[in-house]
Amino acid sequence: MTNAISFNLNFQKFENSINISFPAGLHVIYGESGSGKSQFIYSLSGLKDEQESNFIFTNIVIPEFLQIVFQNPENQILSHTLESELAFASECQTIHPQELQEKLTLLQSDLPFIHDWDRHPETLSGGQMEMLNLVTAFSTNPQLVFIDDGLSFLNDDSKKNWVDWIRNKISRGNVVLWLTSDPTDLAFGDTKWELSLSDFRSLDTIPDLNRYRYRHPKGDLAIKFNDLLFSYSKSDYPVIDNWNCDINQARSIGLIGKNGKGKTTLSKLITGLILPEKGDIQIQLKKKVPRIATLDQFPERMLGADTLASLVSDLVINHKMNSRLVNKCINRLYKYQINWKIIKDQSALDIPWATLRLALIIILGHSEYDVLILDEPTFGLGWKQKMSLSLFFQEILVNKYLILISHDKVFVSDHCDYIYDIDAQIVTRNKTVLINEK
């Protein structure tokens, strides 16, 4: 059975109206941050979105049975255990208990990295949550699936494997519209498209991307650990198993590795948020313990119920930001196309993810912290936003230091003078990003 979809897309301000149809298959739609990818999905699927849109849909013909994989993987999770999360959709279909158990066993086989099904889903890494959400979305055999940047936490190998998995799931004539902020994802599509503020067009080729023109000075950051061991409770295997690292004179350190293999856990050990079972971590800046700030891969966790304005106020009150730098910080936000007046008093949940992430990075960049640990800082950023982030790093890495946790190997290799590959347990010196170094 084929479930083709069609609609008219009208860009009112630009008097541009387009008739679009998608046959069965995987269709990849690229758009910069802020181009309206989430609004595209919400409007086409009939969900309410209070934000003003540059376009409207008419003459919509889509299957009734559809699923959405959301950009923020936490937004899709409803249950308190992994097993109940996996079973939830099937339970809603009132499947016979024996059939449900058989289906649950089959679904679990798609997620072999999970050993304790009583864990809370939020204990997974961002990439692992995305894998879970893909499995739950496809578990009900939908005719149409929207993916809103839902593979952006995955490293290259995992992404290829899951695209193959998706293709296997839609081989009977289903439609998948995958909207992404990463233009390299276009290579996976049966058709390729680009969404902008004024147009929606088909692409024959993938746009050429310029490499980052980035350099920073040599640094004085040192980090060392030997035979580091850490396991989470009820886990059969250690997340960190006798890791070793010795880095000196760094300015920016990149941590790369497969999804769920301990990058975020290592950052928590570095900051002392958790303690190792064996070994210790020494981190020094000019032979002193540095002041460290961490931005979670889920940036809304940093704010909780607070606003960005209250965060800046708290930083000043607690002597973590010089009051004389507040206006400079706000001006920097405007420089990078972030309207402080609009977002400063909004809830974190009401601010677009890419905007919130960039805003927090810029605010921390003006704080008194010496080292910023940024967990997946490029997630959800389009190419232009990544270039802006690169420029900001170049501006602050005269006095600041970075530890970048990322699956984006290109971004890491173009911005880090040391790269720690946790899978291979290898540290690589990368002099190409250093000023006056060959």
What kind of feature is each model-predicted range?
Residues 72-74, 78-94, 298, 304-328:
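Q-loop/switch helix immediately C-terminal to the Walker
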Residues 134, 360-361:
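Hydrophobic anchor residue at the start of the ABC signature
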Residues 30-32, 256-258:
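The feature captures the beta-strand-to-loop junction immediately N-terminal to the Walker
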